[in-house]
């Protein structure tokens, strides 16, 4: 019988390189927020991949970037702490974008913070480009990371090469116990996941100014008194300015209703029951730069 292996794996890369989508594809359920806005992942969410002879715990981090606000600095510190504690780091570089200074900076950061941690290259989004572009990108990544680096091309969307990536990750993990019971997919509390799902719905299709300015706090979750099959969820969406409040709510509240419907469907999937979702929007001026507000909003 093969020895059971287990350990922690962290995907890193510029914002929007497919890290969260990859986490969700490997786990087989949505545990990380995915959005085509950079810097949308804020909490270290652990997705858990179970098989008979191994367990991979995926640590999801915000994309590393040069910080402009106190929130940005805190997010970067969180990423760096994570780097030094995991068994394997997978650096994600999309097949459809040339390697740039941002990728080189991140590679240097990883090597500075965690020089001894196993690092593999992951070329993501290979379904978006022809095979020769994938081959060229593999070569470019190998030039960045050195000739000995293991590099795996994958598509989280189509599932191509996911099994190959899983095998490569497992081969680098130490023998160890299962840290989580079988069937558990994440150790994030449900309220954190609910807040993330609402945030994801609110970010969908809005202008670039909003992502970093939006925080979601779950105010209350309760069972409806007269019904066993209904849970009431009350949440507050915090923005920094009046103009942003208008963007979130939309004309006559239309956009907020859309957000509510999309988020409710996802939360019902998460909880496995019907949900009544009540959303309110409030202003917390410049919360990203204010340590007190950051603390209150969970950062």
UniProtKB/Swiss-Prot annotation:
UniProt GO cellular component terms? cell envelope; cytosol; extracellular region
What's the subunit arrangement here? Monomer. Stays in the monomer conformation, irrespective of the presence of GTP.
Regulation of this protein's activity per its record:
Co-purified with RNA upon overexpression in E.coli, but RNAs do not appear to influence the GTPase activity.
Q: Where is this region: G4?
A: 124-127
Start and end residues of each stretch annotated as G3: 60-63
User: SUPFAM superfamilies in the record, alphabetically?
Assistant: P-loop containing nucleoside triphosphate hydrolases, Prokaryotic type KH domain (KH-domain type II)
The lineage's top-level taxon is Bacteria
Could you tell me the Gene Ontology terms of the biological process aspect for this record?
Answer: ribosomal small subunit assembly
Annotated stretches, region: G2: 39-43
Residue ranges annotated for the Era-type G domain, each copy included = 5-175
What is the protein name stated in its UniProt record?
Answer: GTPase Era
Per the record, the major location class is other
Q: Which organism is it from?
A: Mycolicibacterium smegmatis (strain ATCC 700084 / mc(2)155) (Mycobacterium smegmatis)
Q: Which InterPro entries match?
A: G_ERA_dom, GTP-bd, GTPase_Era-like, KH_dom-like_a/b, KH_dom_type_2, KH_sf_prok-type, P-loop_NTPase, Small_GTP-bd
Q: What happens when the gene is disrupted?
A: Deletion of C-terminal KH domain, which is responsible for association of protein with the RNA, does not affect the GTPase activity.
Q: Where is this region: G1?
A: 13-20
Which residues make up the binding site for GTP? 13-20, 60-64, 124-127
* PANTHER family for the chain: GTPASE ERA, GTPASE ERA, MITOCHONDRIAL
What the protein does? Exhibits GTPase activity. Binds RNA but is probably not involved in ribosome assembly in mycobacteria. Cannot use ATP.
Q: Which UniProt keywords apply?
A: Cell wall, GTP-binding, Nucleotide-binding, RNA-binding, Secreted
Is RNA-binding included in the keywords of this UniProt record? yes
């Amino acid at each position: 019988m093969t020895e059971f292996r287990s350990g922690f794996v962290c995907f890193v890369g510029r914002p929007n390189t497919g890290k969260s989508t990859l986490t969700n594809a490997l786990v087989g359920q949505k545990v990380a927020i995915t959005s085509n806005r950079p810097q949308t992942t804020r909490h270290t969410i652990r997705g858990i991949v179970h098989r008979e002879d191994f367990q991979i715990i995926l640590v999801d981090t915000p994309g590393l970037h040069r910080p402009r606000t106190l929130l940005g600095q805190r997010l970067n510190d969180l990423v760096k702490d994570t780097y030094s504690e995991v068994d394997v780091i997978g650096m994600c570089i999309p097949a459809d974008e040339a390697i740039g200074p941002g990728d080189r900076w991140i590679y240097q950061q990883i090597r500075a913070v965690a020089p001894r941690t196993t690092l593999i290259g992951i070329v993501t989004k290979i379904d978006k480009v022809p095979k020769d572009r994938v081959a060229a990108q593999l070569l470019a990544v190998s030039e960045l990371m050195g000739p000995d680096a293991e590099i795996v091309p994958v598509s989280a969307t189509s599932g191509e090469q996911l099994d190959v990536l899983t095998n490569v990750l497992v081969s680098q993990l130490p023998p160890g116990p299962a840290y989580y019971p079988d069937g558990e997919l994440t150790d994030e509390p449900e309220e954190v996941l609910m807040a993330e799902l609402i945030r994801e719905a609110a970010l969908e299709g809005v202008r670039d100014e909003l992502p970093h300015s939006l925080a979601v706090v779950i105010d209350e979750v309760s069972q409806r008194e007269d019904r066993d099959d209904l849970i009431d969820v009350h949440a507050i969406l915090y923005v920094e300015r009046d103009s942003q409040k208008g963007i979130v709510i939309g004309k006559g509240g239309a956009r907020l209703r859309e957000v509510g419907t999309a988020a409710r469907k996802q939360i019902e999937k998460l909880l496995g029951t019907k949900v009544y979702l009540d959303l309110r929007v409030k202003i917390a001026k410049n919360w990203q730069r204010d340590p007190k507000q950051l603390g209150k909003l969970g950062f």
